[in-house]
């Protein structure tokens, strides 16, 4: 299974919402996809780390690096060619990464599943 599908299924398993995927292949030499998702709580935020890590390992991919592991509002999961940002709703609104990425078209996640 493709790595992006594994990650999207893991995010879905912990009921994250407002998931946006940006195709960065033409924009960044460092990663192919940039994901943003929202959580309702810090517990859900932390659950996303373990679900993504476990599911990637089970699918034969490397263990991701995690920044903000002890944060209760924003974590970044570095899966090498895919970057996943999980925010609480308020933190996502505060940082507003979508505004910074406004020129980049987002991908319909149903096409990736």
Predicted ranges, named:
Residues 36-39:
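Short hydrophobic/aromatic beta-strand micro-patches
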Residues 31-33:
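Short amphipathic alpha-helical segments
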Residues 77-79:
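Active-site beta-strand termini and strand-to-loop segments that position acidic
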Residues 1-29, 42-75, 89-92, 97-113:
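Polybasic/polar functional segments that serve as interface/processing modules
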